[in-house]
Amino acid sequence: MKALSKLKAEKGIWLVDAPKPEMGHNDLLIKIKKTAICGTDMHIYNWDEWSQKTIPVPMVVGHEYVGEVVDIGQEVRGFKIGDRVSGEGHITCGHCRNCRAGRTHLCRNTSGVGVNREGSFAEYLVIPAFNAFKIPDDISDDLASIFDPFGNAVHTALSFDLVGEDVLITGAGPIGIMAAAVCRHVGARHVVITDVNEYRLELARKMGATRAVNVAQENLKDVMKELGMTEGFDVGLEMSGVPSAFHAMLDTMNHGGKIAMLGIPGGEMAIDWSKVIFKGLVIKGIYGREMFETWYKMASLIQSGLDISPIITHHYKIDDFQKGFDAMGSGQSGKVILSWD
């Protein structure tokens, strides 16, 4: 089968002929229809420090996808040939304390599709049936293929009550932009998103952000004044991993504010903890998606009218995968879809 593999311990990714993955009794075999390129895939492509420590070579990568079930393990129930599915990319152990308590997204023995095991940038993918999610008929393949990052956005955005609240999102990558759309859809008042990439800030405006602020050109406190905000943001969603962005968030949060952190700093990050203490802030780390509550919420949000389609900006056939990675690497894109049909 065709597959995109991290074939060598250097920058790049290669289209190869790989063996079709073997199934177990509890697995599904999925024929991939569309995949999307993630920031993680770009880290692997660029072969940065994290990738060098994490990714075994060779490895078929990718973890954002939609496909069709073409074979079913003998112990699997609840799926049939022809079901359209995406799936949770975190494969969990099922026997640690968090798994047994139903907090599977916090499994301490997680294995990642396309990171620690064969991924979805291939004509076929095998995953445990437990990890598969059936896609409703009224949700397109394009949208289903980005459920993984959309889930990061939904999990982060819905960590706290948003109705009537003022929300600050730092980082206008695709996940931050989708989070802005979610916040507006569920009833936030002002949703302000910050970045220095004007292309992505314009995408955020299309997705419904109240204000998309280029912090290289505008002062965040001036924007707050313009919006009539006198006490600070009620909820902060940190999506950038950039220390200066988080510092700005701490400066502009209201007393009693709540912060959800998804962005991963490049290293240790010092902050003024007195602001956290004296403002009485709550800070919550976000990892992955809640299994499978986040997945149900994703489908329901789209079915209730949330439109995240503007975040998809580029489509390529798999033979043109290099153009897709170039588009993602340029910073002048939203989500990039690769078609395997």
From Swiss-Prot:
Site (Important for catalytic activity for the proton relay mechanism but does not participate directly in the coordination of zinc atom): 148
Cellular component annotations (GO), alphabetically ordered: cytoplasm
EC number(s) from the headed UniProt entry: 1.1.1.103
SUPFAM superfamilies, alphabetized: GroES-like, NAD(P)-binding Rossmann-fold domains
UniProt cross-references to InterPro entries, sorted A to Z: ADH-like_C, ADH-like_N, ADH_Zn_CS, GroES-like_sf, L-Threonine_3-DHase, NAD(P)-bd_dom_sf, PKS_ER, Zn_alcohol_dh
Subcellular location as annotated: Cytoplasm
UniProt keyword annotations, A-Z: Cytoplasm, Metal-binding, NAD, Oxidoreductase, Zinc
Keyword Transferase: no
Protein function: Catalyzes the NAD(+)-dependent oxidation of L-threonine to 2-amino-3-ketobutyrate.
Stored PANTHER family: L-THREONINE 3-DEHYDROGENASE (PTHR43401:SF2)
Assembly mode: Homotetramer.
Descriptive protein name: L-threonine 3-dehydrogenase
Organism, as annotated: Shewanella sp. (strain MR-7)
